[in-house]
Amino acid sequence: YFNWKFIWIKAGTASMITQPIVYNGKNAYRSSLVTRSSETVDKYFMMRDTIMAYFSTQLTPLYYRKGAREGKRYYVDEVWYSYSGDKCTTSLKHLTSSGDTYKEKFTYDRCVSDMLNSFQRVRNFDPTGWKEGHTEYLDIAGGEKLVRAKLVYRGKKEVKADNKKKYNCLVLSYIEKEEKKDKEIVRFYVTDDNKHVPVRLDMFLRFGSAKAFLK
């Protein structure tokens, strides 16, 4: 679903899949989020986003890739993670629309993550005792620099999915800084149980907003 001048229309597809894999000889997981606008919406703004994240069975980030076509803009972000003692090193690669490639390497003495891996970590949080406004701070790798992000708990809400079922959900906002102001990127609705299954995603995009529902 896509919000265009306050009218919701069926605008494309979005899917999220997490599956077990073997990465560098070890058991791991691969999570992917794919969004694709419909032919109708393509006339106004084409969107083709594919995000992949690899992480260990303990949810330690291993690799991240985002390939995106948003309108006339196309770019690819990649991050490779390596660890030594208490240090985390990220090797970043950014491909621009013009074909220029930028590479950076940084070492941190704290945990860093990426957006998709952070969402998986959220599913393992224990929200017992959380009040509205509770905030978890995250250091997010991606693009050309490290981004300071946060997850804000918005409370609980009953959500109806595309399968017509209703779910009691926890509501969480993923927020980054843009031009020194908070910018909500995604709002997650996950089931209020031990599994925290994603039921709905509200994505706030450059050209409007979109919603994806559990089928």
Where are these regions (language model features)?
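Acidic, serine/threonine-rich low-complexity disordered tracts
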Residues: Y1-G85, N124-K215
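Hydrophobic, well-structured mid-protein blocks that either form specific transmembrane helices
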Residues: D77-R123
